[in-house]
């Protein structure tokens, strides 16, 4: 009888305490379990105590039954999904996801009828009326609440957090669950700015944070705070005697990489080894992402091979293959990207099904090169037959496809569809991206070839008719929707259309006219040999590169209009010099090059800056050679031969021809010395 009663009591205590235990707390560590085990020896030979214990069990059972009935009523009225693993979701009316996306954490119930009034003390101190708690914190399990998006404006959040931390003991009478709930609803930037306050307040009331809470604060600090502030949050793990996990180190890796300390980011592997934490796939994926963004492709491949052939706990997943396909795209190795896409599906152990992330990566890789466009359509048709649903990045892949292929008509219809999809004007970032692709398509149109077969997936005549109808209010805001989208386009019509699109942006969306978008627009004239338009646009749509104030000569005649223009960057200079080289306009090209040399050391750093500088040098050598300034070409080549650029016979072909015709032996010897066989 004793064993049976003890078993019943243990079960009741588990059921009773499991609803209210703090996050990360082991049930056996609770006082009720310690008291239970300490009292077992006293109960073995005491019949009266056994009777009292049996009565206690009955009372506990009645309370559990009452709790079950309340939970059942809430479930019937709110229609939550039935899943025993999400018991906290059913009881608490909200879903909390760990950063690992694999664990769920229970939090206290939120309805006023369940929580005692003193449990809402954090809400009161924030200055939020208790009846409006759901409104401000999105306690209903919507998609936004699951992703921790806040409905409050930043200034409102700051005001309410100031109200909270104005108290002498802000977290007095609060438990850890309530603090975690507050932090998960904070915008990421506020988690970072108030991380120190939150940790200090936890120490003030002797509350030990969980690793989950510290990971949230550390991840936000890594993205929004200084490196010193991030490391201060990391020190809290030692202060509270908590062991970091893989996701702790992912945040530290991100922090070091954002502050350009790549070596320190990789040295964290030694720290993980010291703490006996085995790096998982998520950690290595973060490293590969850093190597990809830093253009350290060889190291990314070495790490990928380690994951494949040596590591047992960090096998490549779908995200790993997505990054490596992007690496192949950056290296212009499309065949290798296709091999990876095939490998992940056919590997003998644990084959992977491509997700939208991987599919979009391979489609973007194929879209950049017209010779692979047939393969693009082949993969897309296979996916469409399998009822695959494209995502937002798939629209970008199609825009790239039409843009790099110079398929203007298809791209116009595609942009029209995206534009009218939501029934309202897209945001500025989307508009800039769409017109970036459109201007590139205008640049890539080839007039002296047979027209390619332009196709748009799921194209319906009815949809196009509704989009291009003059009665459609959106269509009146797009200059190309009312124009014909069939038949070949002439060079004059293309230039006219491009100018209309640019004037449309000037009138309706002037804020999207960035330096990058203006440069792409200027490349339309450059690629089609319209150097007069290039010169005019170069002079009127940019200002010379920004110099330090000590190098600037004040110009009283500079108008307010000119002050609103963007400064030229290396992309602008490269586009203008390349255009001058192709059209052999020495006066314009040489003037732009001199301005570039004057401003070169003050230009902002850009991605692939060394590659762009190489293109500028090649264009100027061609321009010098064509205009019989061979000594200037030799001088420029001598000055840059230590840059480890890959010179070929083709890139120096014109210079070699001029040197050969003029029998300039030093120039010929220099070319032979520098050219890679």
UniProtKB/Swiss-Prot annotation:
Protein origin, superkingdom: Eukaryota
Ranges occupied by PPR repeats: 210-244, 245-279, 280-314, 317-351, 355-390, 569-604
GO biological process, one term: mRNA processing
Function summary: Regulates mitochondrial small subunit maturation by controlling 15S rRNA 5'-end processing. Localizes to the 5' precursor of the 15S rRNA in a position that is subsequently occupied by mS47 in the mature yeast mtSSU. Uses structure and sequence-specific RNA recognition, binding to a single-stranded region of the precursor and specifically recognizing bases -6 to -1. The exchange of Ccm1 for mS47 is coupled to the irreversible removal of precursor rRNA that is accompanied by conformational changes of the mitoribosomal proteins uS5m and mS26.
InterPro entries: Pentatricopeptide_rpt, TPR-like_helical_dom_sf
Family membership noted in the UniProt record: Belongs to the CCM1 family.
Name the record gives this protein: Mitochondrial 15S rRNA processing factor ppr3
Organelle transit peptide residues: 1-43
Compartment(s) of residence: Mitochondrion
Keyword terms of this UniProt record: Mitochondrion, mRNA processing, mRNA splicing, Repeat, Transit peptide
Annotated disulfide bonds: none
Subunit structure: Binds to mitochondrial small subunit 15S rRNA.
Note: Involved in mitochondrial-nuclear incompatibility, a major determinant in reproductive isolation between species, through hybrid incompatibility of Ccm1 and its interacting partner 15S rRNA between yeast species.
Keyword Repeat: yes
GO CC field: mitochondrion
Coiled coil: none
Major location (coarse): mitochondrion
């Amino acid at each position: 009888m004793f064993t049976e009663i003890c078993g019943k009591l243990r079960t009741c205590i588990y059921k009773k305490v499991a609803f209210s235990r703090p996050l990360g707390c082991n049930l056996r560590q609770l006082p009720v379990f310690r008291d239970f085990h300490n009292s077992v020896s006293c109960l073995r030979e005491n019949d009266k105590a056994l009777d009292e214990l049996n009565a206690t069990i009955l009372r506990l059972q009645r309370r559990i039954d009452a709790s079950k009935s309340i939970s059942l009523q809430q479930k019937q009225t709110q229609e939550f999904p039935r899943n025993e693993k999400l018991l906290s979701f059913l009881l608490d009316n909200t879903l909390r996801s760990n950063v690992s996306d694999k664990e769920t954490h229970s939090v206290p119930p939120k309805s006023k009828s369940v929580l005692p009034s003193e449990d809402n003390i954090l809400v009161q101190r924030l200055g939020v009326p208790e009846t409006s708690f759901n409104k401000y914190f999105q306690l209903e399990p919507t998609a936004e609440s699951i992703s921790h998006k806040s409905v409050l404006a930043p200034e409102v959040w700051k005001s309410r957090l100031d109200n909270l931390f104005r108290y002498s003991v802000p977290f007095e009478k609060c438990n850890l669950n309530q603090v975690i709930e507050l932090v998960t609803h904070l915008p990421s930037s506020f988690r970072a700015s108030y991380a120190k306050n939150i940790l200090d307040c936890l120490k003030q009331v002797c509350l030990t944070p969980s690793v989950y809470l510290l990971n949230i604060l550390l991840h936000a600090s890594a993205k929004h705070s200084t490196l010193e502030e991030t490391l201060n949050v990391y020190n809290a793990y030692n202060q509270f005697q908590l062991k970091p996990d893989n996701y702790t180190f992912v945040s530290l890796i991100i922090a070091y990489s954002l502050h350009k300390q790549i070596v320190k980011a990789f040295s964290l592997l030694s720290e993980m080894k010291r703490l006996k934490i085995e790096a998982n796939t998520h950690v290595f994926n973060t490293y590969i992402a850093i190597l990809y963004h830093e253009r350290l492709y060889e190291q990314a491949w070495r790490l990928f091979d380690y994951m494949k052939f040596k590591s047992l706990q960090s096998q490549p997943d779908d995200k790993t293959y997505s990054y490596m396909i992007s690496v192949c795209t950056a290296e212009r190795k499309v065949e290798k990207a296709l091999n990876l896409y095939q490998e992940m599906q056919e590997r003998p152990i644990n084959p992977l099904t491509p997700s939208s992330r991987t599919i979009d990566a391979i489609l973007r890789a194929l879209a950049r090169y017209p010779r692979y466009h047939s393969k693009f359509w082949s993969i897309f048709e296979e996916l469409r037959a399998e009822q695959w649903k494209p995502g937002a990045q798939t629209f970008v892949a199609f825009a790239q496809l039409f843009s790099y292929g110079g398929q203007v008509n298809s791209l116009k219809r595609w942009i029209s569809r995206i534009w009218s999809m939501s029934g309202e004007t897209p945001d500025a970032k989307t508009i800039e991206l769409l017109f970036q692709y459109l201007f590139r398509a205008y640049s890539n149109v080839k007039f002296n070839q047979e027209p390619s077969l332009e196709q748009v997936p799921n194209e319906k005549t009815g949809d196009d008719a509704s989009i291009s109808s003059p009665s459609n209010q959106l269509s009146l805001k797009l200059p190309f929707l009312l124009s014909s989208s069939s038949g070949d386009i002439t060079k004059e019509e293309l230039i006219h259309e491009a100018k209309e699109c640019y004037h449309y942006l000037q009138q309706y969306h002037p804020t999207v006219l960035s330096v990058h978008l203006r440069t792409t627009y200027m490349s339309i004239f450059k690629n089609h040999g319209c150097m007069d338009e290039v010169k005019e646009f170069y002079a009127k749509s940019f200002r010379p590169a920004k110099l330090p104030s000590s190098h600037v000569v004040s110009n009283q005649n500079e108008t307010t209009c000119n002050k609103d223009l963007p400064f030229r960057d290396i992309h602008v200079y490269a586009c203008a010099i390349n255009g001058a080289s192709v059209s052999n306009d020495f006066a314009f090209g040489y003037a732009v090059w001199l301005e570039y040399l004057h401003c070169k050391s003050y230009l902002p750093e850009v991605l692939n800056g060394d590659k762009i500088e190489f293109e500028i040098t090649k264009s100027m050598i061609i321009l010098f050679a064509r205009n019989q300034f061979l000594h200037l070409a030799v001088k420029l080549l001598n000055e840059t031969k230590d840059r480890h650029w890959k010179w070929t016979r083709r890139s120096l072909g014109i210079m070699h021809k001029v040197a050969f015709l003029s029998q300039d032996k030093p120039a010929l010897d220099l070319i032979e010395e520098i050219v890679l066989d």
